[in-house]
Amino acid sequence: MTSPDQVTRPADTTRISDTALIFEGGGMRASLTSGMVVTLLNAGLAFDWVAGISAGASNAVNYLSGDARRARRSFVDFAADEQFGGLRYFARGQGMFNAEYIYQQAGGPDQALPFDWESFQSSTGDMRIIAFDAVTGDDVVWSRKDTPHIEDLMIRVRASSTMPGLMPPVHLGGHVYVDGAMGEGGGIALSQAQREGFEKFVIVLTQERSYRKVPQRFPAVYRSMFRRYPALGEALLTRWKRYNETRERIFALEAEGKAHVFAPERMPVDNGTRDLSRLAAAHRMGLSQSRRELPAMREFLGVDGTS
């Protein structure tokens, strides 16, 4: 009997040039959407333009490297690593998630979660990783030209994934960066794809269709917490509105036949889940749902099912 996590190799690949592939963030909720990464790779669907924010940035670079096993391990098995994070690391100032280890150490050769840099470099798809400048309140958008070396890539994935208050901000090139979900799309790079001319989208969400974000309680607490970075404090307090508006635009595009949307039928984990059995179950759910929805996605993309 075939394991639901088994990785297969496609007979060939189909390049998709007219459609943007967009991965939402969501911390460990990406354990479920990493199942979509596996399905896309096994199906041989090679998108020429891929964007990700926060945990979606990890899904994006794992997809571009063609590493289905790493896609799963990043959000399932790796959570058991004793250096992954926790209160001990938070107390030391390293973050509830030990970001330097996760993004800048574990991905090296012979490390806990090696990243296939050669395969990433040889892949044809371009990428967009988005982070938020905590000082100016602006988004920064990085592409392949900004990442000539693996170290350049991984620190940018880390910056995009840096949850304010839970992980230390990333200092890079004289700027202070945090999670790209604080930016204009609330964590979904739809506007960036539209600015670059795309009119068709495959969008991988990490919340159920019925989900709506609500305003943060106790705004004065957040403004005080981030008083060094007032633009960040305001962005965090208003994120709910930008996020909900972006999702409304996404579902409108879907109704117009311009977007194929993957939204979890049920999301069994939250952004901080570390329980391996729950994370593995979430991954299997994402794998199963994405496989069931693959024919509809192929039809949307205008490709047959032979690859």
List the model feature ranges, each with a label.
Residues M1-I53, V61-S307:
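Patatin-like phospholipase
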